[in-house]
Curated annotation (Swiss-Prot):
This is Uncharacterized protein MJ0213. InterPro entries: PAB1135-like, Ribosomal_uL5_dom_sf. It holds the Pfam family RNA_binding.
Length: 149
């Protein structure tokens, strides 16, 4: 049912790009074929004209499923994450996509923390849903089942 995953993060001028990449890599298990990972770094400007980079990681197919399982396991390792997602899952699903933000600093330190803030790693899980109606309900059902609630 999972089609693809996109992980993205902003690297501010005051941050080390390698450390942000390490934080993103925390969400990618070692058994994923690196050749199946599409990594893109875009240099641009922030709202106030400050230089920033946007790191995008796209993965499809079987490798995306491995990452999804890994991220689900990371989320389940902390009850705070589960409680937060239980409370606001309806806000995190649109069409056939499930959106989650993770604390970028915590990820660098090897911790998974679901947050709503700005200094984040954004994950977008794109599901193949074949029914024309109730796509969002189907995605919520899949995610809730995976997370055990």
């Amino acid at each position: 049912m999972l089609n693809s995953i996109k992980l993205s993060a902003i690297v501010h001028a005051t941050e080390d790009e390698d450390k942000v990449l390490e934080a993103i890599e925390f969400f990618i298990p070692e058994n994923v074929d690196e050749e199946k990972i599409d990594l893109d770094v875009v240099e641009t400007q922030g709202y106030f004209g400050n230089p920033i980079k946007i790191i995008n990681v796209n993965v499809e197919g079987k490798e995306a499923k491995k990452i999804f399982k890994h991220i689900i396991d990371l989320i389940k390792s902390d009850d705070k994450n589960i409680n937060k997602l239980k409370k606001d899952l309806h806000l995190r699903v649109e069409d056939n996509k499930f959106y989650v933000r993770f604390d970028k600093q915590k990820a660098y330190l090897g911790e998974c923390r679901v947050v709503d803030g700005d200094d984040i790693i954004r994950a977008v899980f794109n599901f193949k849903i074949f029914t024309p109606k109730n796509k969002e309900e189907k995605v919520k059902e899949i995610v809730a089942n995976e997370l055990g609630f």
